[in-house]
Structure formats: structure tokens, C-alpha cells
Amino acid sequence: MKTKKFYQHLYFQVLTAISFGVALGYYLPDTGTAMKPLGDGFIKMIKMIITPIIFCTVVTGIAGMDDMKKVGRVGGKALLYFEAVSTLALGIGLVVINIIQPGVGMNADVTKLDTKGLDTYTATAAKGHSFVDFVLGVIPNSVVDAFAKGEILQVLFFAILFGLALSAMGEKGKPVYRLIDEVAHAFFGVVNIIMKFAPIGAFGAMAFTIGKFGLGSLTKLGMLMGSFYLTCLLFVFVVLGTIGKLCGFNIFKFISYIKEELLIVLGTSSSESALPRMMAKLENLGCSKSVVGLVIPTGYSFNLDGTSIYLTMAAVFVAQATNTPLDLTQTLTILGVLMLTSKGAAGVTGSGFVTLAATFAAIPTIPVAGLALILGIDRFMSEARALTNLVGNGVATVVVSRWENELDVARMSQVLNKELDEADGEADLLMMDPEPEEA
């Protein structure tokens, strides 16, 4: 296989684009702000292809299973893992923010805060986040509506039903199975084309962020940001690193393997932007297609570790900054509410702040107006959230695959140790043939 030069690799191109975006936004803020359509356009192209890929991957994965009980088993194990690890993330954020206490001494007066920028978030949060609303929201009004609006959980729900129905058809369902499998190849080919524009999207998104908010806004609440970034690093390398070690892989090698996806997320602040490539990478790593198809899409609502850390830290920070005392009962109440509201967040920019607003609305102890304190820097913390979310969902997929004995451990070792050509993480990875499955 011909070795690419360093400047031909996607990770180098994206990293360079991010650097130019930061420079443009800093020195020419108005021009940088005008670059926003570039980032928005790239994310829209990715979102355009996400739901068809999820549908095809989940349908072929389920229809290819010989044992239909496996679907429920994989889903159950995934949800068990999601709940345990995301709750651990909430707890870690709670412990760190109470140890460092970055909000103590700010003495912010909520009556004097500018809350105009909160209107959009509080209005969205007010639409309802009850458990019943969440469950009903998973069921689409129509299949076309779910695809048109890009509702991942709704598409996942329909794909599971369709896959089960296709499997029940037996031999009669094989032609449809093969057709959907070929369509999936075509969609991944589209992703391969879209990823050529990743550097442009990362450049536009970063130029806009720096141009609009400025590097100066990073220093005003730097202690909170520093605490959050530190907690995310500890979570990834200590918690996920330990989980990875128990499953037979090194977290540093895993992160190196998905470096291109991480850089795309860094540039766009949305873990969804790397979803198609992440699914292909995990299949290439040795995880079965059926497990990848179920775990990754579900994880984008149930396993957002970075968002979980952010939610507890931001909530307690606002309480500290506004001199709102929290006793043990109130703190545990916040943790309990966040265990529910955090499951409704999506892996898109700004969703964490909407979830936080919904949580504050459910907990009258903390003033909603206090959110104005962190509105200005929320955009800068979204990168760490998205990166942690991506790594967390990747690790979750490997773990569930290992639990199900659906992980090719030997291949994973070869890929992570760069003993296979595919481990280079090149763009043509998305065009590879999937593992063989029986229809």
C-alpha cells in the first residue's frame, strides 16, 4: 500500500485548518464571524447522511443475527453500561467542582445579570423533559418525518423493528437484506466524499467561534473551564483508560487510532460530525457490525460522558457563584434529576446548555438566571464535551462487543499496534467491505 505524505492525511489538514481559523478569528474577528456558513454547511452535510447510515447499519446488523434474543441482550448490556458510566461521570464532576470550588467568591447578583441570551435555551427547555415525553418522543409520527428531521432515536427505533421483521421473513428477506447492505456501501461512499470538506468546515467553525466570542472571554471564567477540561482528561485517561485495560486495549493507542475523528469534532464542537466515520473505524477495529449499529446511535442520547461531567460542574458552579447553599439532600437531588435529563441530550452543539436549563427549571434551588454567568464560555467548553462523548461511545462499543464475544481481539491488537494497513485511519477506510454476516 502506498504511504501518504503527512500533508495528505486528514488529521493534518484539519489541524492546520483549525489553526488558521483561530488566527483569522483573532486578528480579523468580523471576517472570522462571517465564516460561520462554512462550518454550518459541513455539519449539515454530515447530518444529511447520518440517519440513512444508522438505518442501513442497524437493519443489516439485526437481520444478520441468527439469534433474535441477541438484540435485546446487546441493548440491555449497552444501557446498563451507559447508566453506570454516565452516572460515574456525573459523580466525578460533582466531586471535582466541590473540591476546587471555582465559583466561590464571585458573589454574583442574579438580579443584575444579563439574561437576554438565555431566552432561546429556556424556551427549548420548557417544552418538557419528563420520562413519558422522552419515551413517546422515541416513537415517530411517521417514518418519513423521522428521517426528514434527523431524529436519531426515532430512526433507530424504526430500524430495529424493520430489522426484526426482515429477519423473521427468512429466505424471502435476503434480497432486501442484500439491497440495504449495498445501499449502506453507497452511503459510506458519500461520507468519504463529504469528509474531503472537513478542513473547510473546521476552519469556518473555529474562525466563527474565536471571532464572535474572542480569546479574552476564555480568561473571565478560566478556573471553571480549567476545572472542566482537567476533569474530562482525568475521566478519559483514568476511568475510560481503566475500562479499556480491563477489555484488553490501551486508551492512548485507541485515541491515536481515532485522531482524525477527534480533530473533526474539535473543529465542529459536535460529536455527531464524526459519527459515520466512527462507526466504520470501530468495525475495522474488530467490533461486530450489529453491536456497532446498536451501541453508537443509542450512545448519542444515553452515553454522553462529557456532557454529564459538564452538567454537574456547571450546576454547582452557578450555585457557588450566586451564593446559593446546597446541602447533601439538595446535591443528591441535583444528581438524581441530572441522571434523567442528561439522557435526553444529543451530541450536537448547544444541547448540553439546553439540558442544563431544563435541569434548573426542575430544581428551583438554583436560579435559572445564573446560567447567564456561563453562557459566554459554554461554546468553548463544548469542544471538551464533544471529544469526551466521542471517546466514551467508542470505548462503550468495544466493551459491549467484548461482553458479547463479538470482538476480534487479535484484529484489534493488530490495528491499534498499526500492524495492518487499515489502521492508518485513511479516508478510504469508509469504502472497506463490512465483516461478513449471514442474512
Curated annotation (Swiss-Prot):
**UniProt record similarity statement:** Belongs to the dicarboxylate/amino acid:cation symporter (DAACS) (TC 2.A.23) family.
Which positions, given as ranges, span the membrane? 9-29, 45-65, 80-100, 150-170, 186-206, 221-241, 291-311, 334-354, 357-377
Cite a GO CC annotation: plasma membrane
Bilayer topology term: Multi-pass membrane protein
Q: Which Gene3D superfamilies match?
A: Sodium:dicarboxylate symporter
Name of the protein described by the UniProt record: C4-dicarboxylate transport protein
Q: Which organism is it from?
A: Geobacter sp. (strain M21)
Top-rank taxon: Bacteria
Keywords assigned: Cell inner membrane, Cell membrane, Membrane, Symport, Transmembrane, Transmembrane helix, Transport
Q: Which NCBIfam families match?
A: PRK01663.1, PRK13027.1
Q: What does this protein do?
A: Responsible for the transport of dicarboxylates such as succinate, fumarate, and malate from the periplasm across the membrane.
Q: Does the keyword Transmembrane helix apply?
A: yes
